[in-house]
Amino acid sequence: MYQIIKENQIFPNHVLEYRKDRYFYYVLLDGKRIASFHITINTRVGSLSVKLQDADDLYELLNRIYQFLINRYRLEKVTYSDSNKEIREELKKLSFYAKGKILQRVTDPYRLLCKKGTFDEEGFIVRQDNTDVIPFGLFNSKDKGCGWIAAYNLLHLNQINLDIYDVSSSLSQSDFFFSAFGESVFLLYKMLKEKLPVKFLSHTEKQICNRMRNSDCGILLYYHKHGAHFTMYRKIDADKYQFINAVYGRKLVLSPEEFMKKYTILHIGTIIYM
């Protein structure tokens, strides 16, 4: 379990450098310190510096730090100017780009329009009910956006970090009905197939569960009492999967059979999987 803790919470009487615009943090994984960082904020632009102690998954660590900074401080831009080549390469995977000698990432403007809590600590959209400010076709994402949200989350899981508009508009603009009936599962599959090695199956609940067990992640289209819904899933261990944006704000961890039994009313579904 990752934890990001302010420096003065661990050492309340120890101040590294007193500045009102600079904040120091430690990153712990299962209680062990793996990194520290500080952020200097000037008018919603944050300058980041990171020191590594024992980080095995550097991309995951930097993603957690970045998501924390955007969620906590609502920064419009984050910059990185240190010379650590390993960190710089991983930040590029997080959509940081070079501007002179620094790397920077400008925060997606639609993300800043959404309420706090819309994105979780890993950068997944977990509160579709907060996305009414994001258009989707002739509608808004709160009512019709579960398909593109599932696609956005799956791409983010696989280190493809696109802007919200790039994902939502690419799906809504290719829909003949302007998203009046939500997202077409076939258009969703077509778009994802261009970026990821996904496969497709529409079948019975039993076959869907069997296929899910042989995949690491994907998108499930299922049917509940209010209609159809897309959710992204990923494998946690041999028998448990995490379902993102199935129940808003909650990270459900269930077996495929448990999920289908509890949340579906029809014994059929569609899966886009890897």
Which ranges hold each PLM region?
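Short amphipathic alpha-helix that is part of the acyltransferase structural core
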Residues: M1-R19
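Conserved beta-hairpin
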Residues: Y23-S36
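Acyl-donor binding region in acyl/amide transferases
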Residues: R44-K99
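Active-site-adjacent structural segments surrounding the nucleophilic cysteine of cysteine proteases
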Residues: D108-F177
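Conserved active-site-adjacent core of cysteine acyl-enzyme catalytic domains
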Residues: Y110-R111, L162, D166-Y273
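Conserved GNAT-family N-acetyltransferase fold
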Residues: A35-F37, L48, T231
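Short hydrophobic alpha-helix segments
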Residues: N8, F37-H38
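Conserved catalytic-core motifs of GNAT/GCN5-like acyltransferases
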Residues: Y97-P109
